[in-house]
């Protein structure tokens, strides 16, 4: 099968979050499964700076962006058997960042038009075209409404993956003519309109042949008013083509036996290296070096979406216990300030690190006993899977991918891979935290068994790849 991915970011070239991880990993797994895979990404200035000497020029042409004629260069490289093509236009993509400009609508309108028009020129007409989030969600619409006259594109099947429904790409309806060069009929009849705006995500949901999300629970949740971001009734209407597939993690990269960022390696049969990493981490972040105290890790953006309003409200109560917490992250200044203040009040119990440090993050995943992740909503989440890979038990709010990946501790069977609570409130966070502390202190054999179960969980991309192939084969024989 010929499969083409089109996305706004993709590791290792450009990455701001989980979308970049997916584009960096899933195509590689599909190639291993015997498929011909290509990826189209924007050619950002950070790609030029880090990988420019590994990327070759292929061709260039002009793209009509409404009344504008814009330069489009095509560049190319091959990595892990995947052919990466890059759309080059320095005006749109040399901004020092991926998102956040006032003209993001124009930037990604150009990108989508260029990606479609590039397919014939690079001689890669896919059987299946996989687009991701709102930045590329107009492509299924454009293929059927603007480019339907191109015979080579007639049989292309499309899949839209929603990584985060909160970001929908809502713009003025004038963009249809001014940028995409299409008529207003589909806006006037309500197909593309939502809240008196052109909604790119709605277009993708209606026009893609299949819609996937990054976990089965999130696929269900976005059909409810609580999580549907005002598109729940559209998703319910299209529910027959909506499904969820849990993202994977790189099992080779996140491997406690070989991880180059760790001082000591370990496995599920011998956790002595984990204990040594714990002592090393305690020393590094300025906490007393104690093997007996439960060490809780947090690696996250400090936002309300991640549940940190509830954490801050619970923190004084939690820190009354004989416990240590190490936090790494940035975000809302109010939460940054709150954690910094608590660290001054409880210097032997809380280490607050308002920064981003890849090595420290890896050490937290590997060295801690518990990993706190009480997200208000979480389409998939990767941190809880990384933590489990290293025998660090997640404590999570039961939403989205957290519900699908963390098996809550069952005290009757002594089974599970972590701890969870259903109602996001200080009471239930504290109650679940107490359950975990009691198990850690009084039932070490059960705790050790949970660690082993967590480390044996299969979150590899090979597993996720099989689910995506089932989805693809439902469209392409």
Swiss-Prot record:
Synthesizes alpha-1,4-glucan chains using ADP-glucose. This is Glycogen synthase. The keyword Glycosyltransferase applies. GO terms for molecular function: alpha-1,4-glucan glucosyltransferase (ADP-glucose donor) activity; alpha-1,4-glucan glucosyltransferase (UDP-glucose donor) activity. Gene3D superfamilies: Glycogen Phosphorylase B. It comes from Streptococcus pneumoniae serotype 2 (strain D39 / NCTC 7466). Its EC number is 2.4.1.21. GO terms for biological process: glycogen biosynthetic process. SUPFAM superfamilies: UDP-Glycosyltransferase/glycogen phosphorylase. Coiled coil: none annotated. The keyword Glycosyltransferase applies. NCBIfam families: glgA, PRK00654.1-1. It comes from the Bacteria. It holds the Pfam family Glycos_transf_1. PANTHER family: ALPHA AMYLASE DOMAIN-CONTAINING PROTEIN (PTHR45825:SF11), GRANULE-BOUND STARCH SYNTHASE 1, CHLOROPLASTIC/AMYLOPLASTIC (PTHR45825). ADP-alpha-D-glucose binds at residue 15. Pathway: Glycan biosynthesis; glycogen biosynthesis. Belongs to the glycosyltransferase 1 family. Bacterial/plant glycogen synthase subfamily. It catalyses: [(1->4)-alpha-D-glucosyl](n) + ADP-alpha-D-glucose = [(1->4)-alpha-D-glucosyl](n+1) + ADP + H(+). InterPro entries: Glyco_trans_1 (IPR001296), GS/SS (IPR011835), Starch_synth_cat_dom (IPR013534). Keywords: Glycogen biosynthesis, Glycosyltransferase, Transferase.
């Amino acid at each position: 099968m010929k499969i083409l991915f089109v996305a706004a970011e993709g590791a290792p070239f450009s990455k701001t979050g989980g979308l970049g991880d997916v584009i960096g990993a899933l195509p590689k797994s599909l190639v291993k499964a015997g498929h011909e895979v290509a990826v189209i990404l924007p050619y950002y200035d950070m790609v030029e700076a880090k990988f420019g000497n590994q990327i070759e020029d292929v061709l260039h042409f002009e793209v009509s962006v409404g009344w504008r004629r814009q330069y489009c260069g095509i560049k190319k490289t091959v990595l892990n058997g995947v052919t990466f093509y890059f759309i080059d236009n320095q005006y749109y993509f040399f901004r020092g960042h991926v998102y956040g400009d006032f003209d993001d609508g124009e930037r990604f309108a150009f990108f989508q038009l260029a990606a479609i028009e590039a397919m014939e020129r690079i001689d890669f007409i896919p059987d299946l075209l996989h687009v991701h989030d709102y930045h590329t969600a107009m492509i299924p619409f454009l293929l059927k409404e603007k480019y339907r006259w191109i015979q080579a594109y007639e049989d292309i099947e499309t899949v839209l993956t929603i990584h985060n429904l909160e970001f929908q790409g809502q713009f003025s309806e004038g963009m249809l003519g001014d940028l995409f060069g299409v008529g207003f009929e589909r806006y006037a009849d309500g197909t593309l309109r939502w809240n008196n705006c052109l909604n790119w995500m709605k277009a993708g949901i209606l026009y893609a042949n299949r819609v996937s999300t990054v976990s089965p629970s999130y696929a269900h949740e976005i059909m409810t008013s609580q999580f549907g971001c005002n598109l729940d009734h559209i998703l319910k209407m299209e529910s027959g083509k909506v499904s969820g597939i849990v993202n994977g993690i790189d099992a080779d990269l996140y491997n406690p036996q070989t991880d180059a960022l760790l001082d000591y390696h370990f496995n599920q049969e011998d956790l002595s290296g984990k204990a040594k990493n714990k002592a090393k981490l305690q020393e590094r972040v300025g906490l007393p070096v104690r093997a007996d105290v439960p060490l809780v890790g947090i690696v996250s953006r400090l936002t309300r979406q991640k549940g940190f309003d509830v954490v801050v409200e619970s923190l004084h109560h939690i820190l009354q216990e004989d416990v240590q917490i190490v936090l790494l992250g940035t975000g809302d200044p109010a939460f940054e300030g709150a954690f910094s203040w608590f660290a001054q009040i409880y210097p032997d119990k809380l280490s607050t690190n308002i920064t981003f440090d890849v090595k420290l993050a890896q050490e937290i995943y590997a060295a801690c006993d518990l990993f706190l992740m009480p997200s208000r909503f979480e389409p998939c989440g990767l941190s809880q899977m990384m933590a489990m890979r290293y025998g660090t038990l997640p404590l999570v709010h039961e939403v989205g991918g957290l519900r699908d990946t963390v098996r809550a501790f069952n005290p009757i069977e002594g089974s599970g891979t972590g701890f969870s609570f259903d109602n996001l409130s200080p009471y239930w966070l504290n109650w679940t935290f107490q359950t975990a502390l009691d198990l850690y202190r009084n039932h070490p054999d059960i705790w050790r068994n949970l660690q082993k179960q967590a480390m044996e969980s299969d979150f590899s991309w090979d597993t996720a790849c099989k689910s995506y192939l089932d989805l693809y084969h439902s469209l392409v024989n």
